[in-house]
Structure formats: structure tokens, C-alpha cells
């Protein structure tokens, strides 16, 4: 086995993964939660913006709004993480025994 060639391949794979991860972290994803809330979240899971439809804002029922916001943010995070994992898994060659 040529360890130098293997080391070069690993370095190349590491560079590719780092590049894809950085690109993903900078990308902004829009998630529309049931038409009530739009969450804009970056791949690094920082929330860029939250837009709320006026019709769901009821000053006398803040609990419902809080529940909707929590659900929207959790869904945005979950979907973003799944997309990140899919991209990373597609980048790592199968059968390498590395992961």
C-alpha cells in the first residue's frame, strides 16, 4: 500500500470537505412554516431573520405565537442539519473505512 498516495488522497478529501462545509455554513436557507412564519437560517445554524404573518399575532395569546416560533425554528434547524449531513456523506467516498 502506498501510504504517501493515501495521505495525499486524505488531504484532498479534507480540503474538499472543508470547502463544502464553509460554503454550506454561509448559505442561507428559507423555511416557510405552515404559511405562518418564515425562518431564514444559515448553514451554521445562525438565524438571519424571522418573518411573522400579522394574522397570527394576538396580543392576548402570546403562548400560541411562542409555540409556532419554537416549532418553526426547530424544524428549520432539523432540516438544515439533515441537508448538511447529506452533503457531507455524499462527499466522503464509500468503502474508505474512515467513517
Curated annotation (Swiss-Prot):
The record, for Gene3D superfamilies, names: Nucleoid-associated protein YbaB-like domain
The record, for Pfam families, names:
YbaB_DNA_bd
* Superkingdom as given in the UniProt entry: Bacteria
Q: Name one GO cellular component term.
A: cytoplasm
Subcellular location per UniProt equals: Cytoplasm, Nucleoid
What keywords sit in the KW lines?
Cytoplasm, DNA-binding
Q: What is its main location?
A: cytoplasm
Q: Example GO molecular function term?
A: DNA binding
* Family affiliation: Belongs to the YbaB/EbfC family.
The subunit structure is: Homodimer.
Q: What does this protein do?
A: Binds to DNA and alters its conformation. May be involved in regulation of gene expression, nucleoid organization and DNA protection.
NCBIfam families the UniProt entry points to: DNA_YbaB_EbfC
Name used for this protein in its record:
Nucleoid-associated protein UU088
From which organism does this entry originate?
A: Ureaplasma parvum serovar 3 (strain ATCC 700970)
